[in-house]
Amino acid sequence: MPMTTQQRNVVVAGFLGWALDAFDFFILVFTLPAIAREFGVNVPDIAYAIFVTLAMRFVGAYIFGRLGDRFGRKPILVLDIVSYSVLGAAAAFAPTLTIFLVLRALFGVAMGGEWGLGSSLTMESIPPQSRGLVSGILQSGTPTGYLLASIVFGVFYDETFFGITLGWRAMFLFSLLPAAR
């Protein structure tokens, strides 16, 4: 049985969730040296941002998973997407390393909710005979996100548009794209 338009849209949204997660992670990796320079620390000091982002995902998976079970996956997923988009972009405005790390920890909580909510909503929405293929499609979002981050970083980082040079802070503003939809 072919998928309906709504089912295909759910698959695309799930795929994009995984892709944007990987995009954010890789943008952080690419920009570590510039962030470290701006905050006057060594790269290992700023690499702690990777740790707190990943460590807090467990918390987010629990919180958003419970909320999704209680109030429905779709509305909680929308709340989650807005949360991680705003928190990801807020890192662009962090005036200190401490605030940057706190924002990355909160972003990790929100991002932790995306995988469980997006995957379960997708799998519940599609025909059972499509679940193997669709789970592979969802997982291919991760390398797609890495590829997109490489392209965005390669094309836009340190480029000047309208007299403004796009540094590491601008890279985090791309986090707003999911919420814009």
Predicted regions, residues:
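Transmembrane-helix signature of 12-pass secondary carriers
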Residues: 1-181
